[in-house]
């Protein structure tokens, strides 16, 4: 089963935050995960060309950097050879049984998925009344709900992207006009998901928490 379960984790990493990288390296070792840190496009190194798609009066440089790194991850996912591709931001803390729970829960993931959100960012959850015993993967609508935030995303701290999802995202991004990104990453991604009518799922219970929300880290944005 382990041999067939090929997954790579792409980490959206701001390089000055070395303690975050070290913490995650230990986590990946503990859970036997293949990983790749996305370290290009730090906020200090962004070119005018990189920034063309942003309205920089509305999106600060650290968020521009964050979004560009997510886009870079989509490009890698589109072309990689792994069955599953996971994007993590560098402030995440993995569940103690992360690998086993992920392997087990992914057996329920429908093949039509574009994204699967697995973390509890912003403390967004499928309401208990909508959950079913032994069901770990839930379809998530793309519109705003009282319980589900601004749309399909929880935050962009931990989510899987399928090859077809990554391909749609990369194609969409190549058509963006100058100054068209005017929102933080999770709000922008909600808009893209609606524009592309992507198929979105949430995992319950979640298996990733954000270190900036627990107080382990200060926010880097």
Task: Please give the residue ranges for each predicted region.
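An acidic/histidine-cluster motif and surrounding catalytic segment
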Residues: 1-88, 92-221
């Amino acid at each position: 089963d382990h041999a067939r379960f090929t997954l790579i984790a792409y980490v959206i990493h701001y390089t000055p935050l070395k303690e975050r990288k070290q913490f995650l390296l230990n986590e990946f070792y503990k859970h036997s995960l293949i990983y790749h840190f996305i370290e290009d496009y730090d906020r200090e190194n962004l070119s005018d060309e990189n920034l063309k798609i942003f309205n920089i009066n509305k999106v600060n440089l650290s968020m521009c950097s964050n979004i560009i790194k997510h886009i870079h991850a989509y490009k890698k996912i589109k072309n990689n050879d792994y069955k599953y591709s996971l994007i993590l931001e560098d402030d995440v803390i993995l569940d103690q049984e992360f690998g086993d729970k992920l392997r087990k829960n992914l057996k329920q993931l429908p093949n039509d998925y574009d994204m699967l959100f697995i973390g509890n960012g912003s403390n967004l959850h499928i309401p208990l009344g909508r959950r079913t015993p032994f069901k770990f993967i839930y379809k998530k609508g793309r519109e705003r709900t009282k319980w589900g935030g601004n749309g399909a995303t929880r935050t962009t701290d931990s989510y899987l992207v399928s090859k077809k999802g990554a391909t749609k995202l990369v194609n969409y991004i190549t058509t963006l006009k100058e100054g068209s990104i005017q929102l933080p990453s999770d709000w922008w991604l909600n808009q893209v998901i609606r524009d592309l009518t992507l198929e979105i799922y949430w995992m319950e219970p979640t298996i990733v928490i954000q270190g900036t929300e627990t107080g382990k880290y200060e926010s880097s944005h």
